[in-house]
Amino acid sequence: MSSAVRIVEKQLDEILAIARNPAQIRNAGTLAHVDHGKTTTTDSLLMGAGLLSPKVAGKALAMDYVPIEQLRQMTVKAANISLYFEYGGKPYLINFVDTPGHVDFTGHVTRSLRVMDGGLVVVDAVEGVMTQTETVVRQALEEYVRPVLFINKIDRLIKELRLSPQEIQQRILTIVKDFNALIEMFAPPEFKDKWKIDPGKGQMAMGSALHKWGITIPMAQKAGIKFSNIIDAYEKGYVDQLAQEFPLYKTLLSMIIEHVPPPNVAQKYRIPRLWRGDLNSEVGKALLEADPNGPTVIAVSKVNKDPHAGLIVTGRVFSGTIREGDEIYIIGRKMKKKVLQTYIYMGPSRIIVPYMPAGNIVALMGVDEARAGDTLVDPRISDIPPFEKMRYIAEPVVTVAIEPKNPAELAKLVEALKDLVIEDPTLDLKIDQETGQILLSGVGTLHLEIATWLLKERSKTEFTVSPPLIRFRETVRERSQVWEGKSPNKHNRLYFYVEPLDETTIELIATKEITEDQDPRERAKILREKAGWDTDEARGIWAIDDRYFNVIVDKTSGIQYLREIRDYIVQGFRWATEAGPLAQEPIRGVKVVLVDAVVHEDPAHRGPAQIMPATKNAIFAAMLSAKPTVLEPLLRLDIKVAPDYIGAVTSVLNKHRGKILDMTQQEYMAYLRAELPVLESFTISDELRAAAAGKIFWSMQFSRWAPVPESMLLDLVKQLRKKKGLKEEIPKPTDFVEVY
């Protein structure tokens, strides 16, 4: 098999000819921890495809096409590109996605994985497998995306750490071992062994994206190259020769073509995981085969605002062929739209194509109402189930208030904000209808910094941004008594109690194992077997709040007119969970149970304006009598530091309510895993750097929600209430319901 990958400039008709043959398509992308060199690696591939000049590759950061990314040298959005290659005498089309590595942008990674079958995981040879590597590999494996490994920055082992050939070899083996441990931990059972990296089979490459060379073990054996030769190349100044003999793009593309499955193979095992429909139906069979002649089914992975073309929807065609002029149905939004134009991506530029068959990534104009995670289908099969919802690992926990300097520009600002939230569903926008206050929440301070920068660029308005505030959650610690909620007209009475929702059920909601729209019997069976629910209670679930993890259950029997007001009760429940009774923070992990009701016979007396407040007030009263508390977001820190500084680093963490979970020592580094409240994290970076005299790497990511220490609870609730202009004293159940 020839390892030559000939790269030639190809006309569109040739690209379309390959696009029709799934065996010659690969859908892959880069995944990595921040600063491990993903984008520089991708640039090297573009250079190989003749899309960047060799001088510029590695400096151009071509896929970082939002200007702030070039400024901060960091990928913020996931970018797409289609590359043409010849390998082993055959032409291939590689649809490539570059994804962000910074923890604040894991939402973009989640959306990219849906369209990929393979992930090129880039790991820094010095830092090794880090938190974010673990997060993206776990996300990839959850989406049944096969990982291959590129160990980057080998030059640092030679120039900075001055390691010997044996030490370099040992370092690489350690990284492969750590990487395979992640696969053992997170891979689907049937792929645990198959997907582990075997360097001898060419499933791992090593090299330097900066110096544009890369090599696999089989290539090195064939060419008789040893680590000592690579060290020589750096010490004697002939690294360029290394890049000529083993250009990185050839090595990585050969690896992708050989070890990432084509769509018609990958879809056989990915579709049963991503789609809950009947696999023996016409649609099911077409999806499993990636059949270009089957009914059209597209999974949307991202939506971008284009100043000239409106919203551009990008997704993967899993079955059928999409053409300009086709009508398409958006499942879940229950609407038909006409595709005005179809494109493929070449970096930031879109190239118009007449059609795109199954197995490829396509961009569409004209489907403005579609959002990331939606399923687009041929209108004739509009009743099929959509693809599984996407699971975002990080939650928006930091908020800023945004205010236009000129009130006349408010509408313009809000319009631009709404577009931002369409593009990035991990942003959360709240506009207070009464006060006009705009609150934007993101995964971290950096996420918000970039969102507000984009907002300024696009809205062309001047606005102020408040210092960041932490988002909290409200919950309960025990079961309440039953409380009566009365409608304002006194004609309807609803009786509820609340209790904590168990962690297993929260996890089932988070992993989408139970959803609001699945068959109630199937859902009840899962809850009974996995979370120990009572059958009747599990069947009585009316709604699942998968944003904040709450459920409402109907335990009544034989109540007249209850069915007519069910939707209003559910709306009242959702209204309550948005902002709880303690401090108007969202409610998390609460089971709301309806046990009785008296409903007026006349529909005019039992409308939403009567039922929704009765529901909300009873839930609030019940919560306040169930040992309510506030949950704060915690971050997980992974720290690598020189052993001499462990004491200093530990004391910084202790000062900020941090807790060390684990500590190990290897070679010349100590590894600490710790948890730290987000509330305490704003100055931690500078303090850690100072404590370890700069000799420290660390990364942070959202870990979990945990109750605020009892000693802080009262003061925190008062502070939150004061900030929101509420009276400081904590409300009592009787502030929401009448007690006789």
UniProtKB/Swiss-Prot annotation:
It is found in: Cytoplasm. PANTHER family: ELONGATION FACTOR-LIKE GTPASE 1, TRANSLATION ELONGATION FACTOR-RELATED. It comes from the Archaea. The keyword Kinase does not apply. This is Elongation factor 2. Belongs to the TRAFAC class translation factor GTPase superfamily. Classic translation factor GTPase family. EF-G/EF-2 subfamily. Its main location: cytoplasm. Keywords: Cytoplasm, Elongation factor, GTP-binding, Nucleotide-binding, Protein biosynthesis. Residues 23-264 form the tr-type G domain. Catalyzes the GTP-dependent ribosomal translocation step during translation elongation. During this step, the ribosome changes from the pre-translocational (PRE) to the post-translocational (POST) state as the newly formed A-site-bound peptidyl-tRNA and P-site-bound deacylated tRNA move to the P and E sites, respectively. Catalyzes the coordinated movement of the two tRNA molecules, the mRNA and conformational changes in the ribosome. GO terms for molecular function: GTP binding; GTPase activity; translation elongation factor activity. GTP binds at residues 32-39, 98-102, 152-155. The keyword Ribonucleoprotein does not apply. It comes from Pyrobaculum islandicum (strain DSM 4184 / JCM 9189 / GEO3). One of its GO terms (cellular component) is cytosol. The modification Diphthamide is found at residue 605. SUPFAM superfamilies: EF-G C-terminal domain-like, P-loop containing nucleoside triphosphate hydrolases, Ribosomal protein S5 domain 2-like, Translation proteins. Pfam families: EFG_C (PF00679), EFG_III (PF14492), EFG_IV (PF03764), GTP_EFTU (PF00009), GTP_EFTU_D2 (PF03144). The gene is fusA.
